């Protein structure tokens, strides 16, 4: 069964002092505001409103914890970088994100959401800089890839992979589309590997030929 399906909400917190006890491996999802993080989570969980999708970027101000059937925890971090958010709120988010990414002992990996049309912004790089020193893996989802042509998507994927290779060997990158459900199997297999779970029950990752035949 897909790892993220049947995710159940547990708690939301606004301050690092309110973090719940570390019970189970945590996989964090982070991304710039309006990069498609909430849509990606909802698509992976097969749930229309598990993660709140706001029409106003930057409105998600909490860290939200969701328990998975395998016992691990999906952690939805606040979107970052939206200019209209007041400066004091931005500073609060930055402190909360940095504390969580640097200090949370049961955080085993980060799924970093980037808009495929605008990848590796300075704030994306800041997130990587916070997380890389711990040696834990980062998996980048280049979202909204359905808005690019096939050649543009392939070129973007290759370019981002080249750039992150210099930032740390533990960073992997893939294309993803919530709308077209592109890349779901690849994320599942990646996170299953982090958790040490068998991937036998997960859907197979489509081959390039299968994707072309399906019009993706």
Swiss-Prot record:
One Pfam family linked to the record: MMR_HSR1
Domain of life, source organism: Bacteria
Record keywords, A-Z: Cell cycle, Cell division, GTP-binding, Magnesium, Metal-binding, Nucleotide-binding, Septation
Cofactor(s) named in the record: Mg(2+)
Binding-site positions, Mg(2+): 38, 60
SUPFAM superfamilies: P-loop containing nucleoside triphosphate hydrolases
Span of the signal peptide: none
GO biological process, one term: division septum assembly
Binding site for GTP: 31-38, 58-62, 76-79, 143-146, 176-178
Gene Ontology CC: one annotated term: cytosol
Family classification: Belongs to the TRAFAC class TrmE-Era-EngA-EngB-Septin-like GTPase superfamily. EngB GTPase family.
Classification via PANTHER family: ENGB-TYPE G DOMAIN-CONTAINING PROTEIN, MSS1/TRME-RELATED GTP-BINDING PROTEIN
Physiological role: Necessary for normal cell division and for the maintenance of normal septation.
NCBIfam families: GTPase_YsxC (TIGR03598)
Protein name (database record): Probable GTP-binding protein EngB
Organism name: Aromatoleum aromaticum (strain DSM 19018 / LMG 30748 / EbN1)
Lineage: Bacteria, Pseudomonadati, Pseudomonadota, Betaproteobacteria, Rhodocyclales
Originating gene: engB
């Amino acid at each position: 069964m897909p790892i993220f399906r049947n995710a159940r909400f547990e708690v939301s917190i606004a301050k690092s002092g309110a973090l719940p006890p570390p019970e189970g491996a945590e996989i964090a999802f982070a991304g710039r505001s309006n990069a498609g993080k909430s849509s990606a989570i909802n698509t992976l969980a097969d749930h229309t409103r598990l993660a709140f999708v706001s029409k106003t970027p930057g409105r998600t101000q909490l860290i939200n914890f969701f328990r998975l059937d395998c016992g691990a925890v999906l952690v939805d971090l606040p979107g970052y970088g939206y200019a209209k958010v007041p400066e004091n709120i931005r500073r609060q988010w930055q402190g909360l994100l940095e504390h969580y990414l640097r200090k949370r002992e049961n955080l085993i990996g980060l799924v970093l959401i980037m808009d495929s049309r605008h990848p590796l912004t300075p704030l994306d790089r800041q997130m990587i800089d916070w997380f890389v020193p711990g040696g834990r893996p980062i998996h980048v989802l280049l979202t909204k890839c359905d808005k690019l042509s096939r050649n543009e998507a392939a070129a973007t994927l290759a370019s981002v992979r080249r750039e992150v290779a210099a930032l740390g060997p533990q960073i992997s990158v893939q294309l993803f589309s919530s709308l077209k459900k592109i890349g779901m199997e690849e994320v599942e297999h990646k996170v299953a590997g982090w958790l040490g779970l068998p991937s036998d029950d997960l859907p197979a990752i489509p081959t390039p030929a299968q994707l072309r035949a399906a019009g993706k």
